[in-house]
């Protein structure tokens, strides 16, 4: 597994083509021989918004840069006051190493 770097920013949570709420994201990218490029990390929004969408399987994140990302909640539970959630990401993620921002000090054991 090779660490590619991270992407972060803001966007809009979308369900069935309808904008739900604004959100931030902070994702890490990895490349494996079998799965290719994978991505996971956190989205942030108000606790009320996250409670409403947590566990749903049809939520997208449209980034302010125009990418459409499919998010799947990877956590089992969400605390009522929690303003972030862990997610796995698919969709229009960067497909090349050069598109990922390297984060200093990050060490990945292989």
Label the model's feature ranges.
Residues 62-95:
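Short beta-strand and beta-hairpin "edge-sheet" elements
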Residues 1-35:
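Solvent-exposed edge beta-strands and adjacent loop segments
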Residues 32-72:
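Acidic, aromatic-enriched beta-alpha/helix-loop junctions
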Residues 28, 44-46, 90-94:
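Solvent-exposed residues in well-ordered beta-strands and their adjoining turns
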Residues 88-110:
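C-terminal output/interaction extensions
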Residues 11-13, 25, 41, 59-61, ...:
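Hydrophobic beta-strand residues in large extracellular and virion-surface proteins
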Residues 50-55, 66, 79-86, 101-106:
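Noncatalytic linker/hinge segments flanking ATPase motor cores
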Residues 29-38, 76-83:
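Short, ordered beta-strand-loop transition motifs
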């Amino acid at each position: 597994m090779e660490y590619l770097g991270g992407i972060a920013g803001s966007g809009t949570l979308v369900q069935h083509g309808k904008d739900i709420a604004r959100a931030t994201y902070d994702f890490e990218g990895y490349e494996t021989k079998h799965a290719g490029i994978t991505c996971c990390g956190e989205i942030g929004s108000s606790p009320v918004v996250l409670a409403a969408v947590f566990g749903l399987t049809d939520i997208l994140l449209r980034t302010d840069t125009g990418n459409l990302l499919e998010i799947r909640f990877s956590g089992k539970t969400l605390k009522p006051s929690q303003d972030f959630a862990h997610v796995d990401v698919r969709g229009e993620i960067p497909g090349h190493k050069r598109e990922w921002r390297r984060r200093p000090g990050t060490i990945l054991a292989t």
